[in-house]
């Protein structure tokens, strides 16, 4: 049969076009971005990604969390936000009158979260968006979907601020189904990071994770040790080894919420300085706990009891007991297998995993928070949500107490890793030299504390910070600067509650900085004292500080012969109609072995020598004067 030359020519042309297309796409994919900034991938925590249910026509319907307006509509109240709406409903109907409507509302809200006995989803649930190309800041903005970004305007680092630094097309938010086993989601993260690199023309990305998102990131690092997609990894208030809060909610024991902590966390989340203590005048603690316990056990747990991620987040001390009372070894065998893969994997090898990443060249950083009891009632040093020991591996004194005077650092690291208030020993931490601790700061809430926010941004976007001992602005142990902390006292030489000494007779500074942290109210400082008299503060009369204003207060005192602990107490009052007299304590340590940078370290050596000589001369003259006084007394 005679061949048609036209067909042959057409085939050659088509083949050539296809070949050129392949070369063009390969060249495009191989084009490297020379912007000088790694793309950033952000991983949020529990409940942050909006979940949706696939409909028969292929569309997605938002199911959790439901829109606030929908909840308020179900509540039957007109209010600007959910908290105000619930308070309004309580005021209208009282605790007895809201049981039925609340039961119906809560049940309908949590039902889409239901999972089967084997830990798979009962409904066809997926994140509301997925894929790198759909979850960049550029895509969120272009598609008018910024309201779908987790933690919009709260807690998380701000995507838009990062976008201003490195470009909207270089900032991504990994959305995921936070109910699933972290090992399963780690596989999705593995693919997602590869997508981001291909999309942006970069070999590596910087990853910022918070809370449960940090457990996911750690699990990914453990499950995919040969991946090389990451250059920097920041763990912000991470849930790494579990949390008593999750265990407290899953246990069969009565719930005993700490409402002071709960309300303070709520203030921080809402970024408000409003005092919510009036809520407890409406609902006594016992009544509120009974309501919460009843609601949790009868309305929430039936839908969420088989969620693998929750079981993976239980603390290690209570996991086996809670498993024995809540799960069936046969019926839930596959669920338990999923859970224990993660618990026996990354969660049992946290330090090894992080150091393996560091060995590959990844800059790993941890920011943890302390000084707050858990909201769920367990009395342990925490950020309100995650225990310190499970967040960063630290050993802590019993909550409300300090280590005894004869306590020695648990591990010799070559650094002083005991906090100045002697409540935290970070020497046992998962990675102590790359861990920063913020005292009295609540879980997440990066945007609510300017110094914490700045630290996280520097760790994520730069290599400026060598370790937790190398930067004067970011000492390893910091005090919260959030507005709801009211006031802070910091030694001028360290920006912390450590007071190093220069010699046997000389402190590294002779003043503290006292700052009003409120963004809107004046405060009156009436007194500053040290409990054991180590320091005497020069405050002869009360001072008034405007919102955000600082004052330098001088002190005198004799340098203790050995390392010494004391406590500064500030008496103050917010100058508002409802302002009350209040105090805030700051535990501090006078030490000769401070491991961080002091302002003295940044001062030229000849000036330090001159200061020491001047002090020695003053000391000699004082002794001579004392001798002459003694002689004159004999005469």
Q: Language-model segments: which ranges?
A:
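Terminal connector regions
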Residues: 562-598
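Asparagine-centered strand-capping/turn motif at beta-strand->loop junctions
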Residues: 514-519
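N-terminal non-catalytic accessory region
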Residues: 30-208, 214-269, 383-486, 600-609
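Short, hydrophobic/aromatic beta-strand segments
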Residues: 520-528
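Hydrophobic core
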Residues: 14-22
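Short, solvent-exposed loop/linker segments at beta-strand-coil boundaries, enriched for Pro/Gly
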Residues: 529-541
